[in-house]
From Swiss-Prot:
This is Heat stress transcription factor A-4b. Exhibits temperature-dependent phosphorylation. It is found in: Cytoplasm; Nucleus. Residues 295-305, 380-390 have a biased composition (Polar residues). It comes from Oryza sativa subsp. japonica (Rice). GO terms for cellular component: cytoplasm; nucleus. Keywords: Coiled coil, Cytoplasm, DNA-binding, Nucleus, Phosphoprotein, Stress response, Transcription, Transcription regulation.
Length: 440
């Protein structure tokens, strides 16, 4: 390494280093400082490539630095490779003989020969340090292994995410192409608008038309439907008004007929007149009384052979004196009528055939009538039950047709009006038959 040649007393490394630094042709790579007390390696790569192989048969800059340290050279500037020695000065080659090679403080031979065995404390310290280094090494190894596993898992997740991303991109492309084809199809826009209009419409359930709807029916409806201005509502309202006017006309007719029958008709035979009043009392319910006409309850007395004009006049006076009495309910009126009709003996011959004078006709003696001429008529009329089967069937059919649309009060009033109409027709027919019989 140090090479041969040069002065016999000088080490070859020192002589070759001095020649290399003192050569002016190598000042660009290595040379003296301006003071001449040190040298600087300016270009380390070229120094290793060109000068070290030429002078020292190697190109290792570290080995060159170690040799300098062996001969007592030191580094002057930490920013650059500048070395100095007290006897290595420019122009003073003769001072190189004062530079000697330093011997190492600890050599393998001297350590093996002169060093004694380690003490227990030193051995213990070394062992503890070794164990600490082993534990640190194990911790670092486990951490490295965990980091390696995490890295592998992260790589797998990244790969899965990339695959999902590719799938989503493919689906998006297919969806866009499909939508583009649908939009390009003819008639798509019109059908789409029709579907939107169809979905905007609200479904309404048909509501049965009823004049009297209770609260439960309105609450159970799913969809409200306003029929205030509909043609069906107008039609049913007109029909209802017509029917109501017809019923009012019929009611007025019945009241007028009751007035005529109660005031103008007198009977020549012994059958008492208030029997017609009994029928008319049943025709008028307590809630339908007219303020113009009062239908007082008639007190019927049993005709006997000893009854005379005093009985008839007394009955008329009692019937007129009861004008302020309250009306009898429908059910009680029917029961009382049947009870009182059963007490009348239609086949009995009255002792006195004269009746009290009416308000419109003067009092005169009626012609004698053969007893029993109208007994069959009056027996059939008086024994007939007010709620006949025909009237009852008609009322039931009327209620079935109405269903739940009309409440119980309206159904009862309608049944009462139909029953009254039928009885008035029967009264009219039988009065006509009576008139023809009397004429004959």
């Amino acid at each position: 390494m140090e090479g041969g040649g040069g002065g016999g007393s000088l080490p070859p490394f020192l002589s070759k280093t001095y020649e290399m630094v003192d050569d002016p042709s190598t000042d660009a790579v290595v040379g003296w400082t301006p003071a001449g007390t040190s040298f600087v390696v300016a270009n380390q790569p070229e120094f290793c490539r060109d000068l070290l192989p030429k002078y020292f048969k190697h190109n290792n800059f570290s080995s060159f630095v170690r040799q300098l340290n062996t001969y007592g050279f030191r580094k002057v500037d930490p920013e650059q490779w500048e070395f100095a020695n007290e006897d290595f000065i420019k122009g003073q080659r003769h001072r190189l003989k004062n530079i000697h090679r330093r011997k190492p403080i600890f050599s393998h031979s001297s350590h093996s020969q002169g060093a004694g065995p380690l003490t227990d404390n030193e051995r213990k310290d070394y062992e503890e340090e070794i164990e600490r280094l082993k534990s640190d090494n194990a911790a670092l190894s486990s951490e490295l292994q965990n980091n390696t596993l995490k890295k592998l898992n992260m790589e797998k997740r990244m790969q899965a995410l990339e695959e999902k991303l590719f799938v989503v991109e493919d689906q998006q492309r297919s969806l866009i192409s499909y939508v583009r084809e649908i939009v390009k199809a003819p008639g798509f826009l019109s059908s789409f608008v029709q579907q939107q209009d169809h979905h905007r419409k609200k479904r309404r359930l048909p509501i049965p038309i009823s004049f009297h709807e209770d609260a439960n029916t309105q609450e159970n409806q799913i969809m409200p439907c306003d029929l205030t201005n509909s043609p069906a509502q107008t039609f049913y309202r007109e029909s209802f008004d017509k029917m109501e006017s017809s019923l009012n006309s019929l009611e007025n007719f019945l009241r007028e007929a009751s007035e005529e029958f109660g005031n103008d008709i007198s009977y020549d035979d012994g059958v008492p007149g208030p029997s017609s009043t009994v029928v008319l009392t049943e025709l008028h319910s307590p809630g339908e009384s007219d303020p113009r006409v009062s239908s007082p309850p008639t007190r019927m007395r049993t005709s006997s052979a000893g009854a005379g004009d005093s009985h008839s006049s007394r009955d008329v006076a009692e019937s007129t004196s009861c004008a302020e009495s309250p009306p009898i309910p429908q059910m009680h009126s029917r029961v009382d009528t049947r009870a009182k009709v059963s007490e009348i003996d239609v086949n009995s011959e009255p002792a006195v055939t004269e009746t009290g004078p009416s308000r419109d006709q003067p009092a005169e003696e009626p012609p004698a009538v053969t007893p029993g001429a109208n007994d069959g008529f009056w027996q059939q009329f008086l024994t007939e039950q007010p709620g006949s089967s025909d009237a009852h069937q008609e009322a039931q059919s009327e209620r079935r047709d109405g269903g739940n649309k009309v409440d119980e009060m309206k159904s009862g009033d309608r049944q009462h009006l139909w029953w009254g109409k039928r009885n008035v027709e029967q009264i009219t027919e039988k009065l006509g038959l009576l008139t023809s019989t009397e004429k004959t």
